[in-house]
């Protein structure tokens, strides 16, 4: 690539064409330099302003009612990547990612890790990834460090169907196998194992095997993935004695398996259908109506009598263009479990949950859309005595968005102006209320969301 320098045009000349050539050459030069030094900086954040009709606005049940007009925090991810080797068909790249949250309530934003502080920061990734070093799979990526296999997110509900707890590990991704590709990882994620008073804990070593066979072609624009995960404990003799003699909850190995089918549409939309089944503590995560990502512990705390109960989850998510000017996104979730430990209703609980979020939008042009997000959920838990508890509610959000493309789920940056009404119909699981013990809230605000 070369930089083209243009002399000043003669009187009456049209410089536009030459200017375009100069701009293109600079773009090519920038891409060349970026590739030559092997450095990239990627990120994501969301932030904004919001107010309610009665005091500070409150979020509620984002994992069931959706994010639009229902989040008042500034989450961010910042990733730095530097290629450190690229010779003889082998590459090595160092990657570091920071993520966290900045509160939108107070003017100051000092970071801390106490439960009342909204300002949080962590290193979620720090690893070395390579290609060309595996003689049996030179095309595959081999990575070592704090990392995990790619997450699969239900974007409208802000939780993941496929995350994996990870403190450090080793993994192989994109290894060609038959008609698809294989990902496999071995991950460590220690947890705090609590006693029955929840006042004492011990550090329990756990390790997880995560396997996925993906990109299996089915028919035109459709592919399949199958996945499996098994988390096992590694207790010391002293820790086993604490379980037997001092009232600590017993660790139970936990597994999850499932499949996902992704169909891309010719008009640019897509839909993903997934099925998951899990037992023990991973199944407990299925019963949560807020953050429903399948984790082996509750915010790093392991407790509860897990009795090999199981739960299933069916998810549909995606977007489709009904016409050139109308697009609709969806997130539909059905979950059911039997004899699981619920963090709300205890051991030997059964539950059934329905969630539906629909977001139709009218496309005025490439840069403007107006729409509504409609959401409803209903969950019923039954404890071991047969007592039933219900949690349900609905949300209506009207919005107008400034955009850079027409997709609801894959185009950013975006600025959205919204008004949201949320009504909690039943709250027997969390006893939640908005300000002044009210069961509803109207809020208005503006939010920016961007990734690069």
What are these regions, as identified by a protein language model?
Residues 3-137, 173-175, 319, 360-362, ...:
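Beta-barrel outer-membrane channel/assembly domains of diderm bacteria
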């Amino acid at each position: 690539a070369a930089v083209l320098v243009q002399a000043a045009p003669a009187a009456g000349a049209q410089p536009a064409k030459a200017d375009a050539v100069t701009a293109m050459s600079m773009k090519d030069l920038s891409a060349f330099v970026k590739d030559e030094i092997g450095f990239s900086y990627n990120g994501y954040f969301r932030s904004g302003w919001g107010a309610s009709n009665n005091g500070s606005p409150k979020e509620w049940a984002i994992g069931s009612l959706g994010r639009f007009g229902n989040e008042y925090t500034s989450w961010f991810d910042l990733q730095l990547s530097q290629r450190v080797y690229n010779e003889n068909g082998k590459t090595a790249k160092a990657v570091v990612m920071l993520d966290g949250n900045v509160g939108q309530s107070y003017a100051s934003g000092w970071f801390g890790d106490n439960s009342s502080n909204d300002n949080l920061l962590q290193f979620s990734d720090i690893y070395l990834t390579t290609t060309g070093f595996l003689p049996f799979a030179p095309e595959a990526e081999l990575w070592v460090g704090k990392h995990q296999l790619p997450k699969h997110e239900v974007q409208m509900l802000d939780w993941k169907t496929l995350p994996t707890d990870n403190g450090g590990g080793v993994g192989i991704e994109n290894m060609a196998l038959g008609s698809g590709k294989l990902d496999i990882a071995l991950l460590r994620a220690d947890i705090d194992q609590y006693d029955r008073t929840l006042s004492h804990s011990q550090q329990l070593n756990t390790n997880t095997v995560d396997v996925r066979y993906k990109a299996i072609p089915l028919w035109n624009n459709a592919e399949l993935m199958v996945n499996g995960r098994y988390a096992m404990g590694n207790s010391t003799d002293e820790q086993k004695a604490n379980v037997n003699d001092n009232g600590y909850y017993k660790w139970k190995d936990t597994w999850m398996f499932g499949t996902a089918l992704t169909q891309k549409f010719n008009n640019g939309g897509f839909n993903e259908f997934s099925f998951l089944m899990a037992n023990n503590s991973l199944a407990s995560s299925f019963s949560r109506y807020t953050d429903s990502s399948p984790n082996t512990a509750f915010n790093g705390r392991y407790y509860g009598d897990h009795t090999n109960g199981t739960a299933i989850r069916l998810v549909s998510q995606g977007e489709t263009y009904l016409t050139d000017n109308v697009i609709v996104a969806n997130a539909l979730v059905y979950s059911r479990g039997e004899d699981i430990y619920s963090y709300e209703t205890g051991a030997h609980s059964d539950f059934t949950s329905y969630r539906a979020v629909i977001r139709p939008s009218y496309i005025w042009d490439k840069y403007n859309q107006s729409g509504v997000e409609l959401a409803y959920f209903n969950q019923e838990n039954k404890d071991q005595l047969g007592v039933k508890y219900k949690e349900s509610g609905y949300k209506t959000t009207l919005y107008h968005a400034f955009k850079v493309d027409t997709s609801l789920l894959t185009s950013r940056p975006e600025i959205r102006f919204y008004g949201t009404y949320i009504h909690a119909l039943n709250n027997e699981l969390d006893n939640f209320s908005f300000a002044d013990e009210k069961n509803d809230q109207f809020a208005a605000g503006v939010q920016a969301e961007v990734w690069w």
